[in-house]
Amino acid sequence: LFKKAYEVKAKYVGKKVYYRGLIEISNKCIKNCKYCGIRRDNHKVDRFSMSKSEIMEAVKWIYENNYASIALQSGERQDEEFVSFIEDLIREIKNFSNSKLGITLSLGEQSKETYRRWFEAGAHRYLLRIESTNLDIYNHLHPMDNKHTFEVRKKCLEYLRDIGYQVGTGVMIGLPNQTEEDLVNDILFYKDMNIDMIGMGPYILHKDTPLGQEWKDIVVSEEKRVELGLKMIAITRIFLKDVNIAATTALQGLDPQGREKGLLAGANILMPTATALEHKNKYLLYDNKPGINDS
């Protein structure tokens, strides 16, 4: 399966691996997703927001090391202060790099107007994970309130497409009670939504979360989750042929060779973290995250 996926990758997107420098600019979040380490109600988290100059330091490093693009990721905020901070930041990155650096955003659910402002400032890709297309699983991953609905998440992906972004999404793999049929439906969702890039990886628990507690004894083995993660990359590559697929940090979190195995199974994007060292260990969406001491 992996060999076939690699052949399809070589034919449709080439053997080249594209690097995106990932900067985790803030772990402040208004959401309360039940699996995530930086959820609003986790009071053990040391919250931070990088300043513009700190972020630009990281951008400079990424640019000087010949990365083609950067990705800005943070917890979700929808206030005007945050929205205009990002808008200004995008413009500054564009100016600094003479528009050479591609800009990917992963900043959660926003209004169509906000997405448009960021697009017009110069961002051209957006990653917003659907997490799972099985509604029962989706609703179990999130609090049942009007801030965490599948409909809004899907609508946001449609807004992004309408505005002109390259649209990225992805799912968590190896969740308790998730079937192979669910995962196949996730891949069909990528096709139906005409998704351009995919970032998906094995689920990893975070002990200070509701699901980290609820699932700690029933989660499938790490080996099985890695295997499922790699199979998902391979089948997605064979089925969708020319999409961009990331070999995610979560794969590496469960297997030291996980990202390399991901590339051999059909992935073509790596997203090394360029977050400031002093903040890396605060942006922990799950336990045992790799790379937090890498400089």
Regions found by a protein language model. Give the residues of each.
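Catalytic cores of alpha/beta
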Residues: 111-120, 176-191, 253-264
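Conserved, mostly hydrophobic/aromatic
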Residues: 5, 33, 72, 128, ...
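Conserved strand-turn element in the central/C-terminal portion of the radical SAM core barrel
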Residues: 70, 77-80, 104-106, 110, ...
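Glycine-rich, proline-tolerant flexible connector loops at the mouths of alpha/beta enzymes
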Residues: 20-23, 43-46, 71-83, 141, ...
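Core AdoMet radical
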Residues: 40-54, 62-83, 89-90, 94-156, ...
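Generic structural signal for well-ordered alpha-helices
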Residues: 21, 56-59, 86-91, 115, ...
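Auxiliary Fe-S-binding modules of radical SAM enzymes
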Residues: 1, 7, 63, 191-295
